[in-house]
Amino acid sequence: MTVVQVLKPGYTIEAGNGQIRADGTITLIRGTKNLIVDTGSPHDRGIILESLTREGLGVGDIDYVVCTHGHCDHIGNNNLFQGAVFIVCHDISRGDLYTLHDFSRKPYVVAEGISIIATPGHTS
């Protein structure tokens, strides 16, 4: 069974003077493979570590890190997951080994019931 948990909800709030306060959502997907979707900002490190510990997981238990795009509130703690496969935007890599995949043509299947699809958004 695949379970999706929001470890930290994201937000966008007008702050006045042409500024906003914003931070991305951090999501854990547990199944036959464990995924983190977006690793937040660097100041979210403690939230990630505490949340994983609470769930009985460590950083080494995460098989995939999926980052929806390269903004700092989505990739700020990627370095915690040294053993994971990274899917960042349209790149799939483990260390310096890249897997070629055309997301515009088909989903990337991580495990049964878990696929990654392209969803162009505010960075497209």
Where are these regions (language model features)?
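Short, glycine/serine-rich, charged loops/turns that create anion-binding
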Residues: 11, 41, 123
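Hydrophobic/aromatic beta-strand patches that form the interior of the parallel beta-sheet core
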Residues: 5-7, 66, 87, 117
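A mid-sequence, solvent-exposed acidic-amphipathic segment
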Residues: 101-123
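Zn-dependent metallo-beta-lactamase
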Residues: 1-32, 107-108, 112
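Divalent metal-coordination and catalytic microenvironments
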Residues: 29, 38, 62, 69, ...
